[in-house]
Amino acid sequence: MNIVYFGTPEFALAPLQRLLQTETYQVLGVVTQPDRRRGRGNQLSPSPVKAFALRHGLPIWQPPRLRQDPQLPEVLRSLAADVFVVVAYGQILPQSILDIPRYGCINIHGSLLPRYRGAAPIQWALYHGEEETGVTTMLMDAGLDTGPMLLKRKVRIHLEDNATTLSAKLSETGADLLLDTLQQLPQLQAEPQNDAEATYAPLIQKSDYAIDWGRSALALHNQVRAFYPYAYTQWQGTALKILQTWPLIPEVAAKLPEPLQSYVREPEAAAPPGTVLALIKGWGPVVQTGKGPLLLSQVQLSGRKAQSGWDFVNGVRLAIATQFAIVPSAL
């Protein structure tokens, strides 16, 4: 089976790698987003998928605007691919491209559709505290993640998962599911989505990263792991990224690391939100939220390396009753 692969970020690597490892499938080329300026040097850098394709000698196309490229549809048509596989490509495929391959365009989506349609399903599943998500393969249509579904596979979300770890799990699961889908493709019966059950996962905005200590400990924990590594608060006028937290509340006590379970308390308004309540040796500061205490176990001051919450306590001589600024979020 001949395949053209559309993909851009790290999430799209495992399925592409799995295709190349399987003799049944021939990857004819890769379509990915144009190089972007990244890092402190602001240098042009290829997408993870492009870098992978270069290492493996695959033809690469990088149209800035897929809908405005008059030549690419003809190039793709000339390849006579059986199927296009699309994984977090980053642009909507026009009907003129969807109609090209014999078996259509198969998308790997990082949720159990029709839940979390859109650009950021992994992040919003974490944000909403889901304990289960998964991967869906579907036949693409002109809508946003609205095509008929082929196969699904569930993945458990753990309390310590963040956007990076969950993305890696779903990418590997998606790679397995893609091979199963392609193997069964001629016989698979696509299942229409129930639009009444659809939920949405829109693009993330920078304003979503701000920590509002008036929210509950569990809600803030979910925000930190959903938007890892960008959630932040303010400490003495400086941005402080919050990279890892543990809500010290009864409803998740059994899921906490064992050394922390003895610190679990019933939520009470012991101090104004954002106030440091305690310092747990070897772990970090415990902060009052709108409902329950939240342990900050990994943080990063602006311009510095990430560090444990305890190293932060010692480095800045953080004291009990210190107040973190409340930065009202847009959420």
From Swiss-Prot:
(6S)-5,6,7,8-tetrahydrofolate binds at residues 111-114. One of its GO terms (molecular function) is methionyl-tRNA formyltransferase activity. Its EC number is 2.1.2.9. It catalyses: L-methionyl-tRNA(fMet) + (6R)-10-formyltetrahydrofolate = N-formyl-L-methionyl-tRNA(fMet) + (6S)-5,6,7,8-tetrahydrofolate + H(+). CDD domains: FMT_core_Met-tRNA-FMT_N, Met_tRNA_FMT_C. Keywords: Protein biosynthesis, Transferase. The keyword Transferase applies. SUPFAM superfamilies: FMT C-terminal domain-like, Formyltransferase. One of its GO terms (cellular component) is cytosol. It is an enzyme of class 2 (transferase). InterPro entries: Fmt, Formyl_trans_C, Formyl_transf_N, Formyl_transf_N_sf, Formyl_transferase-like_C_sf, GART_AS, Met-tRNA-FMT_C, Met-tRNA-FMT_N. The keyword Transferase applies. Attaches a formyl group to the free amino group of methionyl-tRNA(fMet). The formyl group appears to play a dual role in the initiator identity of N-formylmethionyl-tRNA by promoting its recognition by IF2 and preventing the misappropriation of this tRNA by the elongation apparatus. NCBIfam families: fmt. Belongs to the Fmt family. This is Methionyl-tRNA formyltransferase. It comes from Thermosynechococcus vestitus (strain NIES-2133 / IAM M-273 / BP-1). The lineage of its organism: Bacteria, Bacillati, Cyanobacteriota, Cyanophyceae, Acaryochloridales.
